[in-house]
């Protein structure tokens, strides 16, 4: 299982996808930085919204935070502020993606989830709204959720 420090570092590394529009180049940088933490990047299940990394029996899923240059993220922050997260496509798409990742890896893995800023709020909502994800999550951490 990741330490709090590992989870915070993974959340920070995830922002590389926001600053580098070329996914292949971003994957190379993310892979190198995750490797320093002992994690392997699951490139197929990683993008600007969700980063998936593995270490041993652990599958770590991180939800990215607000990208202030992305109107979709800013609208999500507003929706969150007025209590409309259930109607927000970012919330539902990340739940769907998390379920898909968990199905792909199976029941014999330990799952940890993290999220920073908007990603932390989406994570809390995902755990609240999805019993199947909540029941399979061994550890969840948020950083500056809101």
Question: Which residue stretches match the model-derived regions?
Answer:
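N-terminal trafficking/processing presequences and adjacent post-cleavage segments
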Residues: 1-7
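A conserved cap/lid and substrate-binding interface adjacent to the catalytic center
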Residues: 2, 13-15, 21-112, 130-146
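Gly/Ala-rich beta-loop-alpha elbow adjacent to hydrolase catalytic centers
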Residues: 114-119, 123
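Short glycine-enriched nucleophile-adjacent loop
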Residues: 123-131
